[in-house]
Amino acid sequence: MKTLGEFIVEKQHEFSHATGELTALLSAIKLGAKIIHRDINKAGLVDILGASGAENVQGEVQQKLDLFANEKLKAALKARDIVAGIASEEEDEIVVFEGCEHAKYVVLMDPLDGSSNIDVNVSVGTIFSIYRRVTPVGTPVTEEDFLQPGNKQVAAGYVVYGSSTMLVYTTGCGVHAFTYDPSLGVFCLCQERMRFPEKGNTYSINEGNYIKFPNGVKKYIKFCQEEDKSTNRPYTSRYIGSLVADFHRNLLKGGIYLYPSTASHPEGKLRLLYECNPMAFLAEQAGGKASDGKERILDITPESLHQRRPFFVGTDHMVEDVERFIREFPDA
């Protein structure tokens, strides 16, 4: 049985940014995930369910667990003195860690994706993304350090809190998964070099918004529902409403996750920096593909911390199909 810590040290030589700092950074995220796991499991017994009464910068009502997870991860990262600053979906601006100007890395995160599902005991997750800063080491970080395209990521991953808690990550050398053993307090390797199945047959989208979707996406959904034995259609529809949970299932089983633009969210709803980029990095490392329908997600240069983007991610041929439908059936 190999632990996450042992695996990270063993694999350091495989990537160009191998440093003790990155190992310690991933260890800090691991600690934050353990704390969140513990408190999610007893959320119904203590007063951390439901809305906090506050809103985040996007105008969305923050759940109590959103704020809890944000603070715990922030504290775990700051305590190691290896991160110069963070950007979070739950923070209006970047958070500069005083006294950590010497650090090489910045972290972007969605502390608790799908937190509205907690009240009904459905899987949620944590998403993280790590970059090397671009401003000189020894100076405070600036927003420039965070507004980098996804192809500059050093590492990315997620933790899914479900029937078991799993941490999945990449440093650009494949995707690896670890299951948390609460009796031992360690994450143990369960899958190495994960790959999307070559053929997918699941599509994940909130079809309740169908009337608001672009024409190409509507056509693609109909394509998924048509019967064609040569392409194993109709596909199966599965939608949890938690990006991490939907992505994880499709990674294991083969499929596509779709969150297109809508009439009410013409720029899309998912955040480029906190959700799209890390999941796109993982997808490509697992042999999949990620797109906004027209452009590779990892090639997009962000313009603002909380920028949104349409998002299509999963098995490569399925993402290519939806891109083709968007090209062939543009909105009038």
Swiss-Prot record:
Binding site for Mg(2+) 1: 89, 110, 112
Transmembrane intervals: none
The UniProt record lists the keyword rRNA processing: no
Matching InterPro entries: FBPase_C_dom, FBPase_class-1, FBPase_N, FBPtase, Fructose_bisphosphatase_AS
Example of a GO cellular component annotation carried by this entry: cytosol
UniProt-annotated binding residues for substrate: 113-116, 206, 239, 257-259, 269
This protein's name: Fructose-1,6-bisphosphatase class 1
